[in-house]
Amino acid sequence: MPEIPVGSQIFDVVFHPSSAIAYTGLLNGHIKAFAYGEQGDSHNLFSLRPSKRSCRGLSLNGDGSKLYAVGKSKALHIVDTTTTDIDARSAAHDCAINRVKSLMPWVVATGDDDGTVKLWDPRKRDSVKTYTQHFDYISDFLWLDDKKQLVATSGDGTLSVMDVRAKEPKVVAQSEDQEDDLLSIVAIKSAQKILVGTQLGILSVFNRKKGWGDCVDRIPGHPLSIDTLCNIPDDIPDTDPTSTVLTGSSDGFVRVVQILPTKFLGVVADHGEFPVERIAVGGGRYWVGSVGHDEVLRMTDLGAFFHENHVDSDEEEDDEEEWGGIEGADGSEGEEDEEGKAVEGSAEKGGGASSDESDDEDEEMEPQLGDQSSKRKRQPEVELPDPSRKSKKGKKETVIDKDFFDGL
């Protein structure tokens, strides 16, 4: 697993849309760019320091020519990725800016620690719209291109939907208080459902057709907060990209989770005792960049992960088919005994596991239990042991106990 040391804690990472380049925003205010190869080798392209204060958020425009950076300095910095020239909007907010997202060629959104959201036209010096519906920090943004709507999640426990086309700052909808910090957001199922990560480790599912008032489902399993969410590329084979996401948690794991039906697919990266701050997916071999407090950009080959996972699942299916064929070879029909029914009943009652690992084990056990109930082999009659015979441990020979006959 390639690691790129950066020398400071990383707050955010983004990948160039068409080139093998990763950009990182650091605690010491630096923005570092790295070019990487197919084997995970890398070299430094440039290092800038627009501000001496931390860089908390990064976003690239559609063609990767402009890099937008925000942080504790309250400024919006626009970096030309080719010339490394910097155009600054000083005092863009009244407090530290936490998130930034490029929405359209000439529309950029920023969100600060007080919950204020602003829209910018990079060609102008001042913001074009300001939204104040939140009272706590903005944690993440999601852009819904079909409706030209911006969704923001906040530490105040709500998410809000803004129509950027409206002449006046207009909030289309705002959810009820979810009684938990909303930390991350991503769209699934062709953007018909929205997945939100929370401080308590719950994945909340919103259905756009049913409105934004409240979530329609809550998926437990992560032991700690879900700080970041990321979609997987559309063209990874043997996966459903519309329902599979990457999650980054405070426990240091980057997980692959399938949603609706919910299934834990595996761990992509492990940051040890350090929490995962951000995840992004680059091109080429589908490198996943994950960052935390360990001062390294960790690169993981997502394509290889899914390939190995698919091979392992194929081998398991082959083993199950071979095992089932041997069991049915004698032509006897299976009979369900009371033990089998009891096992199945206990498996059904144990469906509400509280961790990803236990959910995975339950789902792996279900098909095995089904095979045992439908093709249970008739058990051979067991011959009761003769009390006059005792067997020595470790040997198959039988020894006659003479004392037994003396007592008759």
Swiss-Prot record:
Pfam families with a match to the protein in the record: WDR55 (PF24796)
WD repeats: 5-44, 50-86, 87-130, 133-172, 177-216, 221-267
Region ranges (Disordered): 311-408
SUPFAM superfamilies assigned: WD40 repeat-like
UniProt key word Transit peptide: no
Ranges of Acidic residues composition bias in the record: 313-339, 356-366
Biased composition (Basic and acidic residues): 396-408
Protein name (Swiss-Prot/TrEMBL): WD repeat-containing protein JIP5
Annotated source species: Coprinopsis cinerea (strain Okayama-7 / 130 / ATCC MYA-4618 / FGSC 9003)
